[in-house]
């Protein structure tokens, strides 16, 4: 659950990978999820929003990817050694279930009575799926192009032109200007402090692959 001083967001990571030892015994893979869901209040259980459920399914998709591996060499088993085109495929695929009426009806209900989610509420939720979807796609394209250009055009002698590059990308794909004082790249941890350098495009590409899976 979310708590003070805890890093925000949600992610999956591997504890150990699948490994077949010389004597034949198998070290089974272990994965863990870190999330920031709403805590229980008083004597009531934690009640997840649809967005939190989608986040859980996304990260659990990464976990399943790691734990169901059939490769017994630790360096390339599970989430390791996966091409960038596919690294987000399992997680995005599981997200799709959060938008299936049958799946939502199965996993949801009133926490006290067990009554299913009212059909009218379910219909409204599903109808909102693609609300402002174009803006979301443009945002992901902006992040992906910015990431690509930073790593492809970088010249050690000249240094990185971070804000200039972002401004040029935004002129191509953004429909809303950013304030001049904005410093979004400073918090773009995926490509600066995470493992997605030159690979952020995989999120949007995984949506295409998962839709066809």
PLM regions: where:
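Cation-handling catalytic/transport regions enriched in His/Asp/Glu
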Residues: 1-213
């Amino acid at each position: 659950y979310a708590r003070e001083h805890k890093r925000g967001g949600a992610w999956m990571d591997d504890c150990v990978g699948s490994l077949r030892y010389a004597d034949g015994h198998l070290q089974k893979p272990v994965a863990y999820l870190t999330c920031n869901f709403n805590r229980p209040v008083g004597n009531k259980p934690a009640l997840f929003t649809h967005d939190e459920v989608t986040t859980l399914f996304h990260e659990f998709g990464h976990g399943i990817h790691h734990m169901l591996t059939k490769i017994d060499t630790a360096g390339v088993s599970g989430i390791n050694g996966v091409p960038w085109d596919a690294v987000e495929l399992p997680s995005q695929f599981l997200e799709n279930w959060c938008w299936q009426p049958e799946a939502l009806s199965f996993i949801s209900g009133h926490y006290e009575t067990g009554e299913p989610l009212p059909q009218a509420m379910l219909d409204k939720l599903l109808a909102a799926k693609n609300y402002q979807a174009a803006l979301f796609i443009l945002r992901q394209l902006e992040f992906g192009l910015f990431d690509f250009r930073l790593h492809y055009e970088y010249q050690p002698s000249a240094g990185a032109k971070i804000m200039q590059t972002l401004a040029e990308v935004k002129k191509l794909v953004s429909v809303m200007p950013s304030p001049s004082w904005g410093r979004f790249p400073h918090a773009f941890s995926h490509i600066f402090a995470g493992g997605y350098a030159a690979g952020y495009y995989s999120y949007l590409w995984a949506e295409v692959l998962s839709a066809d899976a």
